[in-house]
Amino acid sequence: MIKYNGSSCLELNDLWQALHSSFNSAQFRSIDKLILNECDSFSPMTWLKFSEEEFSCTIINCKDSSAPSPDKMSWGHLKHIIKDKSCLKNFVCIANACFDLGHWPNHFKESKTIIIPKPNKFSYDSLKSFRPIVLLNTLGKLIEKVIGERLQFQVISNNFTHQSQLGGLKFKSTTDTDIALTHFIRTGWVKNLLTSTLAFDIAQFFPSLNHHLLSLILDKAGFGPQVARFFLNYLINRKTSYYWNNFSLHSFDINVGMGQSSALSPILSALYLSLFFHIFEKHIKNLDLKISTLSFVDNGLLITQSKLFHLSNDRLFSSYNVVLTLLSKFGLQVEHSKTKVFHFSRVYSTFNPPP
């Protein structure tokens, strides 16, 4: 029996309401858009028309075995269709028209949300033990992939993303995160310093991205009014239908967040956090806290080095409070139960750091 807010979901309608409220809990969360004034706007970038080559190169990497979309079209179908150059040209025209008009068709805004259980959970009476998988229409997904590729390369060219961000971006991976952390630890040991870290997890990160703030961040990043206008329309009036086993319900409005199945989720979420890390860095410098950061999508790591445990703990505690304050201004929250502190020492005897 699924429980939500202490009450059992006895009727299907109770379940649907619980699902929607749980996976869209941030829709009424406040933001502080004035926080963006702490960073300067980046130089405007030119947005060129899409090309047939961009579409052809993108669809090659799409796996035919992907889950079927709401429009029943597979990647294999689409690959066959674009062999006809006139069809490919029409797809490119649709994508360019979307940016010219600042419009994303309602057909592409409709999705299916499949609820699946997370593996190896002790109990499945809570919605936290389940994961939403969002299925989008295939042609819309293709255009999103092309847009995502374009955004990735443009933010790399203007260095908008923060150097600590190692997830959701091209040419960066979990391996880079491991290498960077190992480098921190070993260079600290060479200097006879203890390396201490605080790991935190942003709760329901993708469903919590505020659409209005995201459009302002895109403008700050230098994408210009054409791109900002497109995303203002892209993000609104989205709808999803929930599916649980053999049951379904049509449909709910979605006014916050990004579906993790969207090709735009990695880059848009990275852009969303870029300004957070730039602003966090300024606050840390003003407080004279010797803190470094690493980030992989929705997981953050605060790093400090010293010879004294209490000094490291004080720095981590102070910087963690800065993280919580700034994230709240971005409409985000930390899942405190997952926050952990780790100390990396080269002491070979019994190692028992203070709490």
Protein language model features and the residues they cover:
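Surface-exposed loop/turn segments and immediately adjacent short secondary-structure elements
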Residues: M1-S126, K141-L142, T161
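Mobile genetic element proteins and their domesticated derivatives, centered on retroelements
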Residues: L19, F55, S69, F91, ...
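Conserved, non-catalytic sequence blocks in retroelement Pol enzymes and Pol-derived host proteins
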Residues: P44-F50, S65-P68, K79-D84, F99-H107, ...
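Conserved catalytic palm subdomain of right-hand nucleotidyl-transferase polymerases, strongest
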Residues: D64-S74, T113, D125-L135, T175-L216
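Catalytic palm active-site di-aspartate
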Residues: S69, E110-T113, R131, Q165-L166, ...
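Conserved pre-motif C helix in the palm subdomain of viral-like polymerases
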Residues: D125-N159, D176-A180, A203-F206, I254-K285
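Conserved polymerase palm-domain catalytic core
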Residues: I202-V297, Q305-N313
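Short, conserved micro-motifs composed of acidic
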Residues: N246, Q333-P355
